[in-house]
Every structure is written in structure tokens, then in C-alpha cells.
Amino acid sequence: MVMKLAPYGVFCLTARTFSGIGFDAFLPLLKYMAGVMTALAIQGLVVYMAILKGFTGLSPVRFLKKFLPVMGFAFSTATSNATIPMSIDTLNKKMGVSKQISSFTIPLGATINMDGTSIMQGVAVIFIAEAYGIHLTPANLATVVVTATLASIGTAGIPSVGLVTLAMVLNSVGLPTEGIALIMGIDRILDMLRTAVNITGDAVCTTIVSHQEKALNREVFNRN
């Protein structure tokens, strides 16, 4: 009952805050969201697709068209683990990827390949540092890159787990973990997006491995 009513309570509190302090107070959060969304879009639609094309010669457009339902499911559930069966089935039946390979790489990727989470944490650290007026040196930024990467490896594929590991990243550069509260209210939307990016990366890597192992049926992939 509490979980069902909580969103309404949060909405009322947000509406009250909005009416009291105005729209300007939300501009930094909107910029943060825009920054994360832009980075995720570049990773999912540019970087991954360029890697797919470069290593396999397959059409990125056809790949996205066939994998879009899986991305939509991942977006709605915000969990990589729940998407595993659908990813394996889609790769096998619609893209010609070996099920023997996908049954290994997709669950593995759902555990260690959290690019979207790393991206969010990098942007979040910069946002929180600016909110507290703390300057980050190049050495601090390098530490964030390494820590965010390590924190994403082995992270459970469940909703909002990135906020939990973000605390470790903040501690690595001496930022207050209380800053997580600044972005907690809007993280659900970003969590859904980064989950879609994460599982897309898993699928791209699986397709590449299947191609390199000569276990990719191109006729199935090119079939409408």
C-alpha cells in the first residue's frame, strides 16, 4: 500500500516545492538530465552501432529495428536481469546469433557490462561537485573514471542500483554522499534509459562474438 501511494506523495511534495521556489530551481536538474540522456544516446546509437558495423559489417539500422522491442522492455522494467530471456530469444530467432553463445554472454553482460550506469555516475559526480562548490582536479576526474568503471562491474541488474554504487564513487574523490539525494527524485527515468543502453551493449557484444566464432546466421539477420 505504501509503495503504491508513495509516487502520489512525491508528486505532491514536488508540486508544492515547485510552486514555492519557482522553475529556476529545477534548471540544474534539467541540465543534469539532458547531459546524461545525451551521453547515453551517443553510447547506444553511435558508439555501439559503429562497433557493430566495424566488426561485423551488419546494418545498425536493421539491428536496432529488430532489437527495439527488447530495448522497450528493458526501459519499462529498468532491470537487465528480467530482460535476459527476451534478449537471448530475440538474438537467436531474429538475428541468427548462436543460442549457445548468447546463453553465456547475455547473463554475463547483465552483470559486468553496465556502461550506462558508469556514464550516469560520471555526470552525477560532476553535478554534485558543482552543487557543493567543490572543484575537481584532473586527477579527481581520472579517479572517477576508474572507480565508476569498477563499481559497474559486478553490479546487480536491478532498478536504481547505480545510486547505491554512486556512493562509492563519491567517496573516492571526497564528495559528500548526501549529494545523492539531489538526483534521487529523477533517477527513475534515467535508470530506465541506462538499462536500455546496457542491454543493447550486451547484444552488440554477443553478436560480434557470434560473428567471430562463425556462428552467426546472416540470412536470419537480414530477413525482414
Task: Show which residues each predicted segment covers.
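Transmembrane alpha-helical segments and their short flanking loops
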Residues: G122-N224
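Small-residue-enriched core segments of transmembrane alpha-helices in multipass membrane transport
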Residues: L30-V47, K66-F73, L141-T155, T165-L170, ...
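Helix-loop-helix junctions within the multi-pass membrane cores of secondary transporters/permeases
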Residues: P69-S152, T206, R218-N224
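Loop-to-transmembrane-helix entry motif
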Residues: M1-L5, L29-M37, F67, M71, ...
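Alpha-helical transmembrane segments and their lipid-water interface positions
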Residues: M3-F11, V47, T117-Q121, R194-T195, ...
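Signature of multi-pass transmembrane helix bundles
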Residues: M1-R62, E219, R223-N224
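Membrane-interfacial loop-to-helix junctions in multi-pass transporters
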Residues: M1-L5, T38-L40, T56-F63, M95-S102, ...
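Juxtamembrane helix-loop transition segments at the membrane interface in multi-pass membrane proteins
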Residues: G54-K65, L91-M95, L170, V209-S210, ...
